[in-house]
Amino acid sequence: MLFRSCHRHGLKLLIESTEDESREPGSFVNLVRSRSIDGLIIVNLRTADRGYLERLREAGIPLVLFGAGVMDVEDVPTMGYDTGKSAQVATEHLISLGHERIAYVSFAQREYHAVGERERGWRAALEARGIEVDPAWVEYADIDAHSGYLATQRLIARNVGFTALFAGNDTIAFGAIRALNEAGLRVPHDVALMGYDDIPLAAFASPPLSTMRSNPVGHGRDAMQMLLAQMNGTTFQADLQAERVAQLVIRESCGAYLRTVR
């Protein structure tokens, strides 16, 4: 989507990762200061990256923050999504189906702001219903399906008796399905499962995955419009700080169709 928007406006899209910033401090900021780019969209700001924001503003480059954990940043146009509230909605859906022992497997380690936000949303939903949260219900995966598989295996090995699992994203949920199946636990008959993102493959999982649709394409389009407005010296019509809540998508993996209250 960003590529198409850039092409339509005669711009080139440059993708730069900040994963190695700890080894090469300031390299990304130096790229900005070199004036090699005309505008910048930062996706999923990490907690560790926040120290760069003031330096980026000082460079005078049009800037938009996009993704989770950006709404508390002042004086920068942001297109965010309330990942905490979205996780709360997902967990509340599982609770509405009769589940109280709901485990959570994150999509990454704690350095990502969205990891903490989704965990807080999951926890808030449980505590609002008077459910005491067991720390043993939480595991941390690391982006890919295999890590979700291993994290779910660790949960199962603890014998904490969870009847539902909220996965931090759909890819983690795919790994969880395999681990649950290998342990003889059927989804959703024995363990209900919720994902997050609604990636294209989610509808084709076995069983089809219930999830939260975050609409990154639409939000990315709005973020691009915010950036173009700055680059052209005009004002974007929408709010300079816009936040969305993901949409609940109910398929088979959560067990809603079973009408079973445990």
Region roles according to the model:
Residues 1-39, 108, 119-120, 124-127:
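Amphipathic helical "hinge" segments at domain boundaries
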Residues 1-8, 86-89, 113-132, 147, ...:
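Short, solvent-exposed amphipathic alpha-helices that sit
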Residues 20-21, 42-89, 131, 171, ...:
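Flexible loop/hinge segments that line or gate small-molecule binding clefts
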Residues 36-44, 103-106, 138, 159-169, ...:
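Periplasmic-binding protein-like
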Residues 79-104, 120-124, 145-154, 173, ...:
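Hydrophobic alpha-helical segments within soluble ligand-binding/sensing domains
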Residues 88-129, 236, 240-254:
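An alpha-beta-alpha
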Residues 100-101, 133-137, 187-192:
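Short acidic capping loops at alpha-helix termini that bridge into adjacent secondary structure
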Residues 151-262:
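Flexible loop/turn connectors
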